[in-house]
Structure formats: C-alpha cells, structure tokens
Design a protein with these regions (language model features):
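Bacterial Sec-dependent N-terminal signal peptides
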Residues: 1-28
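OB-fold nucleic-acid-binding modules
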Residues: 19-69, 76-270
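Extended, low-complexity, turn-rich repeat/linker tracts enriched in Gly/Pro/Ser/Thr and Asp/Glu
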Residues: 52, 166-171, 378-380, 390-403
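Extracellular carbohydrate-recognition regions
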Residues: 267-327
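Terminal, low-complexity interaction segments
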Residues: 281, 393, 401, 407, ...
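Surface-exposed, low-complexity/disordered Ser/Thr/Gly/Pro/Asn-rich loops and linkers
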Residues: 309-380
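Extended extracellular/luminal ectodomain segments enriched in beta-structured repeat modules
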Residues: 365-367, 376-394, 459
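Conserved Ser/Thr-centered positions that define the repeating blades of beta-propeller domains
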Residues: 409-412
C-alpha cells in the first residue's frame, strides 16, 4: 500500500514544509512527474459528495464525462492564502472528508499550471492520502469581487455585497431536454439527450462588478421550485478560473458552490438596482405583444407579427428594431421547476421571450440594431445599467449559424450620435435537439449586464442600442468542438436569422 504513516510523512514533508511557500514550490514543478518524498499538506475545502466540484468535459456532441467532478477535490493552506486542485484517478478514490487536514503523497503525480497560475495535480489515489486531523475550522476569506486575484484561485472565498442579476427562475434556466438526466428530470420520454452539463447564473455587487456561478446540471438543488433570493448578501464557494466555452467571456474568475446552502442572501430585501424600464414576457398571461401603435396583439403560434415599438411592462419607453423584421413569441426557460411551464419536464414558459426574425444581411450590410428608448428622468445613482438575456436560432441546426458573433452596446442622448460601451458581447445559438450539436451552443439564454455612464441618468430620453460589432459570423462545423466564431460574412451568405430576447431591463445603479 502507498498509504504512509504519519511519522514517515513528517520526514517526507520536509521537502516542501521547509519551503517558505510549499504551494508555490509545487507550481514550480509544472510539467514534471513528481518524485518520491514530495508530500503536501492542506485543508480539504471540497466535498466529494457534491456534484458541482469541477467542470465535466465534453467527450462528444452528445456525451459528457460527468465523472470528472466526482474525481475533483481542492485543498488549501491552513492560512487560506493558497490552494491547489487535485484530481483522483477514479471517483471512488476521492474520499477526502471536507474540513479535514490531510497530507498527500504526490510521488508519480503530474503538475500543471494555467495562465492564471491555478495549479492542478493529477494521478492521485486514495492510498496517497493520510488524514492528519478530522475537523479543522475553515474560515473563508471575505472579499469584494474587485478584490479577487490569481492567488485566490482554488481557495475558499466569501464574496460579499452581491445579488442575483436575474432573479427569475432557478440556478439553471435551461432546456432540460439537452442537459444531464437526474432526479429532477429523469422521468422524461424520450430520455434526455444529456449533451450539455454546466449552466449557471451571475451575481453582482453595488459597483456593477459581476461573477459567474457555474452549476453542473447533475446537481439536484439547482431547480427544485425554490425562487432565487431578492436581497443583497453573500455567497461562498471555491474560486476557479472562468473557462466556459458555451457562455463566452464570463470574466476571469468564477465561484463554484458546493450547494445552494452557501448562498446567504435574504429572500426578500432591497436591491442596489432600481428598474427604469423592463420588457419581460414571463407574466404574459394573455400571450400578446403590446405595441405602441396597435395595442395588445394576441400571439398565434406560427403567425408572425410585423415589427413595431413594444411598450415596456415597467416604466415608459419603447423596444424596437431598425431591421426589416417580424416578431414572434417563443418559450423562455427561466422557470423555478422543471415541471413549470407549458411542457412538463422541459422547464419552459410559453410565449415568454421575443423572437426577432429577419435576414442576416439586415445586420451585416446595413445599420440594423435593437433599440431601446427610456426616460431616466427622476432617477439618480452611480450608473445606468442595461441587462438582457438572449440567444440565436429556433432550436434547429439550420438556424444555428450565419449570424453575427460579436455585438456592441451603444448609448446616445439624441438617437443619432452613439458611443460604444461594450463591443465584445457574444451571441450563441440556442441548443438544438438533433444533429451533432456544437460545443458552443447554449442550453438557455445567456445573461448580459452592461454598465453605462452616470451621465445618462436624469434625462427625458436616452437611447441604447445593440448591434453587430464586426463581420465575424458564426459558422457550423462537422467537428462540434471547433470554434464557431470563425466565419466572415459576405452578401451571398445572407440567410434567415432569429434573434431571441428573453428579458431586457434598464436599471439605475443606486
């Protein structure tokens, strides 16, 4: 057996314990197979019973290796200043008790370090681990989002003063048919495709900073019918690098929750953000579009409505497109339970999102945009914020490509002269249920939050628009792992395009 007695460990540990920073010493061995006598001590901050400890890799378009999360664990130094990720050879090898102090013999293991300095050790077995102490008090470091740094990666962190950006739905607002089967949704027939795993939500603070909370869809707590908290509080978890290709640029860091018990946010309470205007079809019980010049138009499935100026549900203003387009209402996936909505087991809400149907030439060749007009008169604060959820396509492979990949958000006080606030917003195709689906297709609508200048507050009217930022086009590939943001538009490539907006809000950051 490779399990070592504590007395032996004491001598072996001298190799690293004598170092001023043993975790940095391990990082310096990146690319090597570690030699005999390399032992590291630390406190276990992960839980082997959790289904949310690591990202499960895509094996093929319709298969995910869900065992990776079970093989993943994290230890940090007793002072919480440094941490490493350890990956066991098998799921049954990972039995390190949470909050225990352990010593791990790293002989024969491999070390890798990513561009952010996050360190991973692979090749560990149960016999390599000795528990030195059963229970150790683990106090997470308390930080604001702006205070996070690379040295915090793979440590236990509490992020304070945050609230959910999108407080409707669940931790995973997804089409349940395309994600992992679990006790939540494994009653469906035909069986789930199980071709996508990780989903998640954002929290943000009173400065407009945000961080992604990735949630593996095997996690039972993710969508049990509970509503998300409304207030401002704190979340605790393991800080990890943010690399989630389906969701584009989600920031540098993400916070992995062990479970939703680590969310300490009041269910009710005030927000740092005040709604100026909101377009949201979730409570659209009449299944109608409210157009400025035509009033409520009853939605009929499969019948397009000529585009117009849509009246907001909250506040005053208009939402419209300058493209030659028609409107439709399509499902939204922001329900609290998989049983909610019009298709039990899917978790979708009938007529809960706006679909803008047009040709891609309208967006690539002209100056087409989604435009928002709103009055900010009477609103004060630190900034104006534009929040929206969106995706592209109709849930079919033939509508999952050919559209602009990168988009910009711009603002104006006169509707003519616009200033760019962001130009790297990614638009992903919504997951489709057949064909070799791209690894970049999203299981639900992506969340976006763009902070705009304070000078836009207190105005009779402001103009915000969302438009293509370049001629980079989403392509489809035989290899589903290949980057879809690789095409370049030309007129002969014009095709039908469905842009879907689940919700759009203009808010004042107080």
């Amino acid at each position: 057996m490779r399990k070592l007695a504590i007395s032996v460990l004491a001598s072996l540990s001298a190799v690293l314990a004598g170092c001023q920073d043993p975790y940095s010493e391990i990082k310096s061995m990146a690319g090597q197979t570690l030699s005999e006598g390399t032992v590291v001590e630390g406190v276990v901050i992960s839980d082997y019973a959790s289904m949310n400890m690591g990202e499960n890799p895509q094996v093929s378009w319709n298969e995910v290796d869900i065992m990776m999360s079970y093989k993943t664990a994290y230890i940090q130094s007793e002072n919480g200043k440094a941490g490493i990720r350890v990956i066991f050879d098998d799921i049954y090898e990972n039995r390190m008790p949470r909050s225990s102090k352990v010593a791990i013999d790293l002989a024969g293991c491999s070390v890798s370090v990513d561009e952010n300095g996050a360190c991973t050790v692979t090749g560990i077995r149960a016999d390599d681990v000795t528990v030195l102490k059963d229970r150790v008090a683990v106090k997470p470091a308390s930080k604001r989002i702006s205070e996070l740094k690379d040295s915090d990666l793979y440590t236990y962190v509490t992020i304070t003063g945050v609230e959910f950006i999108n407080k409707e739905g669940s931790y995973t607002n997804v089409n349940e048919y395309v994600v992992q089967a679990s006790a939540l949704n494994d009653f469906r027939k035909p069986k789930n495709l199980e071709c996508i795993d990780v989903a998640g939500v954002y929290v943000r603070d009173g400065k407009g900073e945000k961080i992604f909370l990735p949630v593996n869809t095997s996690s039972y707590w993710r969508r049990r019918g509970d509503r998300l908290p409304d207030g401002v509080g704190k979340v605790t978890g393991i800080l990890v690098p943010a690399d989630f290709q389906r969701y584009g640029n989600v920031g540098k860091y993400a916070l992995r929750l062990i479970s939703n018990r680590e969310v300490d946010i009041p269910m009710d309470g005030s927000s740092n953000y005040e709604t100026v205007a909101e377009w949201n079809w979730d409570r659209n019980y009449k299944h109608a579009l409210n157009l400025e010049d035509r009033g409520l138009l009853k939605w009929v499935s499969g019948v397009a409505t000529p585009a117009g100026r849509i009246v907001p549900e909250i506040g005053s203003g208009a939402l419209y497109t300058t493209a030659e387009a028609t409107f439709d209402l399509v499902p939204d996936y922001n329900t609290r339970s998989v049983h909610d909505g019009h298709r039990p087991g899917i978790g979708s809400r009938k007529a809960g999102a706006l679909e803008i149907d047009s040709r891609t030439s309208e967006w690539f060749e002209g100056d087409a945009a989604v435009v928002v007009e709103a009055s900010t008169k009477g609103f004060r604060g630190k900034a104006l914020v534009l929040d929206f959820t969106w995706a592209a396509g109709k849930g079919r492979v033939d509508s999952s490509f050919g559209f602009p990949a990168y988009w910009a958000v711009e603002y104006s006080l006169n509707g003519v002269d616009y200033t760019t606030a962001a130009d790297d917003i990614l638009l992903r195709p919504i997951a489709y249920e057949k064909s070799p689906m791209s690894y970049y297709a999203a299981p639900g609508y992506l969340e976006n939050s763009i902070v705009l200048p304070k000078s836009l507050l207190g105005k009779k009217k402001v103009y915000l628009r969302i438009r293509p930022a370049s001629d980079v086009m989403v392509e489809t590939h035989e290899d589903p792992s290949k980057d879809i943001n690789s095409g370049v538009y030309s007129p002969e490539k014009s095709r039908d395009f469905a842009l879907v907006i689940g919700k759009l809000s203009v808010k004042a950051l107080r």
